[in-house]
Every structure is written in C-alpha cells, then in structure tokens.
C-alpha cells in the first residue's frame, strides 16, 4: 500500500494553502505561497526527498516562495505555460494588493500542459487543466484528493475576474 501524507500551512495575507505531499519517500510542494522561512521550518520534519514544486496557477500569493525552494533544494518548478504573463506581473499585482516588498520571479522549468500526469513516489499525479480563475489554472489529482488552488473558495467558486 502506498503511503501518502499531506501537510498544509496557510500563508500570507490571504491565507494561501501551501502543501507538502509525501508519497513513498518522495515529496512535492504545491503552491508554496510567499513565506519561505515559515514553510521551510514547518516542512523540515520532512524526511523525504523533495522532487518538484507544482503550482496550480501563477498569482503572486501562490508563487512567492518558489525561487527560494528551487535554490535551496535544487528542484524544478512546474506551471502551465498560459501563466507566464501572470507570473511576470507578480510584483505589480502585489503593489496593487497593498503588499510591500517584491518576490523573485521564478523561471518555469516544465510547462504543465505538456503532461497528462507525473509520477512521484510511484504514484500518478493527474494534471487537469481547469481554466477560470486564470487561463492556465490546473488541478492536481492524487487518488481521491484534489489540489485546485483558487478554483474554489469556501462556499463559493474562485474569482474569475482577476488578471
């Protein structure tokens, strides 16, 4: 039987859910938000090997810690190619949102639209293109779990009116 463990931390102004998913000795980070130090400390009990960072979309509140994780752990970053312009606008959008400081804009290592799934720890992670919140939004399906970013909010659909 495959062991899957999910840890999450709500980070940043809008309490973005950042996830560490551990599957049979390998880990992925999903939507690491923008508080690298908090996440790195929280996830330090992780005894598994980080394999990659997967992002559901490119808004700044989901990608702020990506570059720090890439640099520290030498792992690739996966994002849908339709998110490139959103990613490039991250610091402008932070300013409009009234959030001080800047994030380091990460380079996309792999475009999610090129994959139907990826395998981590011997388990298939299905990649579903779910545009609406952003043009390149995706949902990750692992067994009966969905990681959908801002596709849904509590008791409502996610915003579809954001750049």
Describe the role of every protein-language-model region.
Residues 18, 39, 65, 88-90, ...:
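Short, function-defining helix-loop hinge/capping sites that tune catalysis or transport
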């Amino acid at each position: 039987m495959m062991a899957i463990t999910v840890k999450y931390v709500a980070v940043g102004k809008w309490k973005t859910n950042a996830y560490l998913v551990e599957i049979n000795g390998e880990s992925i980070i999903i939507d690491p938000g923008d508080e690298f130090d908090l996440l790195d400390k929280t996830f330090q009990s992780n005894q598994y090997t980080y394999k990659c960072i997967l992002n559901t979309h490119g808004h700044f509140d989901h990608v702020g810690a990506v570059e720090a994780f890439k640099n520290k752990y030498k792992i690739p970053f996966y994002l849908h190619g339709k998110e490139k312009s959103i990613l490039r606008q991250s610091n402008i959008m932070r300013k409009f949102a009234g959030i001080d400081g800047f994030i380091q804009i990460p380079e996309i290592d792999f475009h999610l639209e090129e994959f139907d799934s990826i395998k981590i720890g011997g388990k298939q992670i299905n990649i579903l293109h779910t545009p609406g919140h952003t043009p390149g939004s995706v949902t990750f399906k692992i067994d009966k779990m969905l990681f959908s970013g801002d596709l849904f909010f509590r008791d409502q659909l996610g915003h579809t009116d954001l750049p």
